[in-house]
Amino acid sequence: MDSLCLRAAPASALASGPAFEALLDGVRDRARLGEFDRQRHISRDVIDAFKAHGVYRALVPKRFGGLECSPAAFCEMIERISHADGSAGWVASFGMSPVYLAALPLETIAEIYGNSPDTVFAGGIFPPQAAEIVSGGFKINGRWKYSSGSMGADIVGVGIAPRNGDKLDLPRLAVLPRSQARIEETWDTVGLLGTGSHDLVVEDVVVGEQWTFVRGGKPNLDEPFFRYPSLSFATQVLSVVGLGIARAALDELSGMASGRISVTGAPALADRPLAQVDVAKAEAALRSARAFFYESIERAWEHVLAGDPVPVDVTNLLRLSSTHAARVAAEVARSAQMLSGMTGIYNESPLARCVNDAQVVTQHAFMGDVTYQNAGAMFFGKQPLPGYL
């Protein structure tokens, strides 16, 4: 598996094989029965199955028992899971957590993965809450929203702004056992219901400084993956969820197109010329966006493997291709629903779920129009806004 994982191109061992296909079939069946949406989180046995497959150790360094996969290999795995269910793919995407945790002291990282390279991390960053500096570290109190996957996490991270007198230092993330945080089930949305992106509440917990880090800080790991643009990767693992959802929508439409009889007596969907035109346009749009997405990843990864810094113009394409993929995916899912007619409007319709899930992906702050503004500025030779690269 290792040699395949290190390849820059997709089609890795993590995204294929009989055991993985069986896992996806199970996730798909349970999603269609409404299990994840109804309970508003991914079931613990599914998280355990993700662990067994290697979702959470995929990007962990080999020295800690991980697989050290490439960004493309990881993204393709998340895309395949998202094809089975968008919420499951979103939760699985937090297997990218080594990107964040790499900024912890090396001894802390070793302790986390010494317990298990399959450790599941989740958390809420915003808004950073003021933390009192006390003996032994930081005393933390607060509430954090959008803590996706926290119901199945082993450890969680919360955003803090340490208070030094009347001054607040740089925002940090504090890492603590899941048992020291309370989850308030506030996640009630039109899509991605199964992500369980509830509120995290922490009350009077002291966290040692060695269990905190500045988000986006210099990594303390030197494996190739940790030279890949971290903010770009954080966006990519989410936008690739949209690509998987959109592919599921087109596959669902194709499966129903020949057998569906119109109540008006019109020809089957597959026999309608305008439907043929529209589905071809949707396929072209999705395949083009996907190609741009993976091409950008591979180009950046080539620089990493060569030992060179990733140029800013390449990083710009990572950000642009990521937002573009999410936007196109949502449009494609909606096109598939439109072509399905009234069939696609029922709550139990997989197409309806695809549309809602894909739209929620586009609502993430990473996928806003500001990406296009920054990318366009760079194409004109101007500087992007702070925090873009």
From Swiss-Prot:
Intrachain disulfide bonds: none
Induction or repression: Induced in the presence of IAA. Expression is probably repressed by IacR and exposure to IAA relieves this repression.
Keywords linked to the UniProt accession: Monooxygenase, NAD, Oxidoreductase
Pfam entry (one): Acyl-CoA_dh_N
GO MF, one example: flavin adenine dinucleotide binding
InterPro entries, A to Z: Acyl-CoA_DH_C, Acyl-CoA_Oxase/DH_mid-dom_sf, AcylCo_DH-like_C, AcylCoA_DH/ox_N, AcylCoA_DH/ox_N_sf, AcylCoA_DH/oxidase_NM_dom_sf
Keyword set includes Transmembrane helix: no
Protein EC: 1.14.13.235
Substrates-to-products reaction catalysed: (indol-3-yl)acetate + NADH + O2 + H(+) = 2-hydroxy-(1H-indol-3-yl)acetate + NAD(+) + H2O; indole + NADH + O2 + H(+) = indoxyl + NAD(+) + H2O
Top-level division of the source organism's lineage: Bacteria
Keyword NAD: yes
Major enzyme class: oxidoreductase
Function noted in UniProt: Involved in the degradation of the plant hormone indole-3-acetic acid (IAA). Catalyzes the first step of the pathway, the conversion of IAA to 2-hydroxy-IAA (2-OH-IAA). Can also convert indole to indoxyl, which spontaneously dimerizes in the presence of oxygen to form the blue pigment indigo.
Family listed: Belongs to the HpaH/HsaA monooxygenase family.
Note: Transformation of P.putida KT2440, which cannot degrade IAA, with the iac gene cluster confers the ability to grow on IAA as a sole source of carbon and energy, but not the ability to chemotaxis towards IAA.
Protein name as catalogued: Indole-3-acetate monooxygenase
Organism name: Pseudomonas putida
